Amino acid sequence: MDILKVENLTKIYGKGENSFKALDNVSFSVKRGQFVAIVGPSGSGKSTLLHLIGGVDRPDGGHVYVDSNDVYARNDTQLAIFRRREVGLIYQFYNLIPVLNVVENITLPVLMDGRKVDEERLEELLTVLH
């Protein structure tokens, strides 16, 4: 079963003669448990692709399906929940919030989503980090 399916994904930045097609009808699928690497030179559309898969930006054409659900059939509120609960993007250069300690950095996304921190899971994570 496909956990991710990208169909004819297109993203254009700018308008008219100043427009730039960052993605042009990109299609692929990923099966559950499969590992994928997205590689290419600077400016080849890797970040744009990931932003569209993760619901950070909206495509100009095409579809993204995560677990058979169309990511862009959601409204903005539903997309925000999707980003918080269903996908995660880790950038090459990520930053922790320097004024927060380790526990606060780990629990911040859960608290921002209005959920209670699972103390048992937190202890497991801290054990791994230690």
Predicted features along the sequence, with ranges:
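Helix-to-loop junction immediately C-terminal to a conserved catalytic motif
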Residues: 54
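A short, flexible loop at the N-terminus of ABC-type nucleotide-binding domains that lies
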Residues: 1-3, 12-25
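Short coil-to-helix segment of the ABC ATPase nucleotide-binding domain corresponding to the Q-loop/switch region
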Residues: 100-109
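Conserved ABC ATPase "signature" region
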Residues: 69-70, 117-130
